[in-house]
Amino acid sequence: MTEILTSDDMRSLERAAIASGRASGLELMERAGAAVVEAIAEAWPDIRPPAVALRHAMILCGPGNNGGDGFVVARLLRRRGWKVTLYLYGEADRLPPDARANHDRWRRIGTIAPLPAAPDFSSADLVVDALFGLGLTRPLTGFGPIFAALASAGRPVLAIDLPSGRDADARADAAGWPSAPCSLAVTFHREKPAHAQLRAEGIGVIVKPIGL
């Protein structure tokens, strides 16, 4: 039987890896971003440069380490020839240290715009949802127009860990929380309780190792 980890379990594993010196937080973030880019190439080979003309990824980065993963994805996709548009929800000065480091690395090669209230996703070949991951403990407010715009655009959406708005631990009281549309979720090391719900809804789930 496949092992399922709660969000607390996953954070404990990451902290243990960092404390033991087996990996730094930055290294884990880099591995996660690289795993997402690998999953993109596997899931959508038809939109992978250079086999086709320049492709456009829109990446939505949030205020935590999920957003940090998104900055890594942006940098690595650009290196592979993608056009990248990156939006940040929140203030750069309030990002956790590892996420801020990857924000700064991206800023040296690309631009960052504040996340609009209702973005236009019509030009995107792929949207990466790196807004909120495993740490969400409350329903999101104010994201309805963003999620609606994403749904109406009909573009492929890859979520890092989980679609933003989902509770990783699938608690009963979180069943009605609003969440982003999603085509594929890429999570790391092991599935979390919410991934069974995604599969039941016909959403793809890929688990990638990051050396934990």
UniProtKB/Swiss-Prot annotation:
Cofactor(s), names only, from the UniProt record: K(+)
EC number: 5.1.99.6
Similarity section: Belongs to the NnrE/AIBP family.
Binding site for K(+): 66, 129, 164
Lineage: superkingdom: Bacteria
Binding site for (6S)-NADPHX: 65-69, 133-139, 161
Highest classification ranks of the organism: Bacteria, Pseudomonadati, Pseudomonadota, Alphaproteobacteria, Rhodobacterales
InterPro entries noted in UniProt: YjeF_N_dom (IPR004443), YjeF_N_dom_sf (IPR036652)
Function per UniProt: Catalyzes the epimerization of the S- and R-forms of NAD(P)HX, a damaged form of NAD(P)H that is a result of enzymatic or heat-dependent hydration. This is a prerequisite for the S-specific NAD(P)H-hydrate dehydratase to allow the repair of both epimers of NAD(P)HX.
Keyword ATP-binding recorded: no
UniProt cofactor note: Binds 1 potassium ion per subunit.
Keyword terms, alphabetized: Isomerase, Metal-binding, NAD, NADP, Nucleotide-binding, Potassium
Keyword check for Iron: no
Stored Pfam families: YjeF_N
Segments forming domain YjeF N-terminal: 10-212
Catalytic activity: (6R)-NADHX = (6S)-NADHX; (6R)-NADPHX = (6S)-NADPHX
NCBIfam families: yjeF_nterm (TIGR00197)
GO MF annotation, one: NAD(P)HX epimerase activity
Protein name as catalogued: NAD(P)H-hydrate epimerase
